Regions:
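Ordered, soluble secondary-structure elements with a strong preference for glycine-centered loop motifs
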Residues: 15-20, 73-78, 125-129, 183-187
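Extended, well-folded interaction surfaces typified by the phenylalanyl-tRNA synthetase beta subunit core
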Residues: 2, 7-9, 13, 17, ...
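Ordered, amphipathic secondary-structure segments that act as subunit-interaction surfaces
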Residues: 62-116
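Short beta-strand-to-loop capping motifs
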Residues: 8, 68-74, 117-123, 177-181
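Core RNA-modification/binding signature centered on pseudouridine synthases
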Residues: 133, 137-231
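Short, charge-patterned binding micro-sites
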Residues: 38-70
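Short amphipathic alpha-helices in soluble, non-transmembrane regions
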Residues: 79-87, 127-137, 192
Length: 231
């Protein structure tokens, strides 16, 4: 048995798949490619596969990562080629590497993500540098985060530590934001967008699309993709 870590995309055609549906699409691709997989034991065996994150419905991603335990003698390159031959539109294997047999769950170590949120603007003459300055310069921003279980007040700047950057084209603005993912929680890019609209008067609407540009492991040495680490 060997453990492979693969980078996959979630393209536009899969935007409205939930994480569960996306995971099932990946498993179907593996079955179609006839990859011999290791399975869990018990009454309901399932493929030994784990994801770096749970992508929300409506979010695309430049790269999602999976760890998978395979019972194959085939090379990594051949396995990736077999998967891509049967991949559905919007899903592609972008790269991979063989990992040590025992690695940490990626969901436990991936703690930083870069998002691009794009939507229409209501003022094409807006100065986005000036509009973003109060948000980017604040040391603390209180926000009431509502979940099905409870409502709690969080400090947005605990999670959005770097300046948000705006680019405008054809009546649309793209806000690029780096967001920390910590044991105590995180903030959604949609929540940052709506907070900017409601509290900082950014000239945007409630309509937007979200693309996750990267998910990474951040430590004292820097930021790395899951393919750049060995744990």
């Amino acid at each position: 048995m060997k453990k492979l870590r693969l980078a996959l995309n979630k393209g536009e055609k899969l935007r409205f798949l939930s994480h569960l549906d996306y995971a099932q699409a990946v498993e179907r691709m593996i079955r179609r490619a006839e990859i011999k997989m290791a399975y869990s034991e018990g009454f309901n065996p399932h493929m030994k596969i784990s994801f770096s994150s749970a992508l929300a419905l409506g979010v695309t991603a430049a790269a999602e990562y999976i760890d998978m335990d395979v019972l194959e003698e085939d090379s990594l390159e051949s396995i990736m080629e077999r998967l891509n031959r049967v991949a559905p539109p919007g899903l592609e294997v972008l790269g991979g590497k063989e990992m040590p047999e025992k690695v940490k769950k990626m969901m436990a170590i991936c703690n930083f993500a870069i998002y691009e949120v794009t939507g229409p603007i209501t003022d094409e003459n807006a100065d986005w540098n000036a509009l973003l300055k109060p948000f980017n310069g604040a040391t603390e921003i209180s926000y009431e985060k509502v979940t099905p279980k409870k409502t709690r007040t969080i400090d947005v700047k605990e999670f959005v530590k770097e300046p948000i950057v705006a680019s405008v084209k054809d009546g649309m603005v793209t806000l690029t934001m780096g967001i920390g993912i910590y044991p105590q929680g995180t903030i959604k890019p949609s929540e940052v967008w709506n907070l900017g609209k409601d509290q900082y008067n950014w000239p945007i609407t409630t309509g937007y699309e979200i693309h996750r540009k990267a998910i990474m492991v951040e430590n004292e040495e820097g930021r790395y993709t899951p393919l750049e680490i060995n744990y």
